[in-house]
Amino acid sequence: MGNQTSQRPLSQRQLRVGELVKQNLGELFIRNEAKIPFINSKLITVTEVRMTPDLKTARVYVIPLGGADTKETVRILTEYSHLVRKALSKRLDIKFLP
């Protein structure tokens, strides 16, 4: 059958919510509101956010400034994703926080 979700174009709502999440994550990292240990979140750039059709899951693409230690940065962000979600929930007023 294959992966049909990647072939379907994103809806306007998915794009709009994805951009909202991207913008707020960028501001959150600049202001270090998530208080993530071991990394300087001011040096993280959010390049893209892809939302699932039900808007309950987001895939966030980030890159550290200069591209150094990308794997380590992603590992730390994944480990402390609960802090990022908590800080993001204070900024966004949507039904389901991805």
Predicted regions and their residues:
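Charge-rich, low-complexity N-terminal segments
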Residues: 1-57, 63-98
